[in-house]
């Protein structure tokens, strides 16, 4: 049992699927968390209409363009210290299973790089804040 909003397009369409469907779902969870608990096309009330909108004719590039035009992608990038997290989420959420990470290990590697960069940035920020107080 799953939520349509987090369901990979091939699962929703009743087509054969593999491990990349889980990667898609995880990507949607990360998108949701990084975007103030909003999903793509969150202005649409019906989750079925939202998933249909994501799937109908949108390539990954078009999806990024639409997100940017609505100010969502900019918001995500502001909340993410490094663009690699944005790219990781978009790769995980690709409509085409072949364009997604092919394993959780591959996705984990990019997430670990991102975490390392975020932690380094946070440490620098804390040091800068402490120095400002002196």
Where are these regions (language model features)?
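Conserved activation segment of eukaryotic-like protein kinases, specifically the C-terminal portion
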Residues: 1-10
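Structural helix C-cap motif within protein kinase domains
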Residues: 35-39
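Conserved catalytic-loop aspartate of Hanks-type protein kinases
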Residues: 22
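Conserved C-terminal C-lobe helix
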Residues: 79-93
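Conserved HRD-motif arginine in the catalytic loop of eukaryotic-like protein kinases
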Residues: 100
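Conserved end of the kinase activation segment
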Residues: 11-19
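Regulatory extensions appended to serine/threonine kinase catalytic cores
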Residues: 119-134
């Amino acid at each position: 049992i799953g939520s349509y909003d987090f369901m990979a397009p091939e699962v929703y369409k009743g087509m054969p699927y593999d491990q990349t469907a889980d990667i898609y779902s995880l990507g949607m969870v990360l998108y949701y968390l990084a975007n103030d608990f909003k999903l793509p096309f969150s202005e649409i009330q019906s989750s079925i209409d939202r998933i249909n909108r994501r799937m109908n004719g949108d390539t990954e590039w078009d999806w990024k363009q639409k997100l940017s035009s609505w100010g969502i992608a900019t918001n995500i990038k502001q909340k993410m210290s490094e663009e690699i997290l944005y790219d990781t989420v978009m790769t995980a959420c690709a409509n085409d299973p072949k364009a997604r990470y092919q394993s959780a290990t591959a996705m984990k590697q990019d997430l670990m790089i991102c975490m390392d960069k975020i932690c380094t940035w946070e440490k620098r920020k804390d040091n800068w804040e402490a120095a400002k107080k002196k």
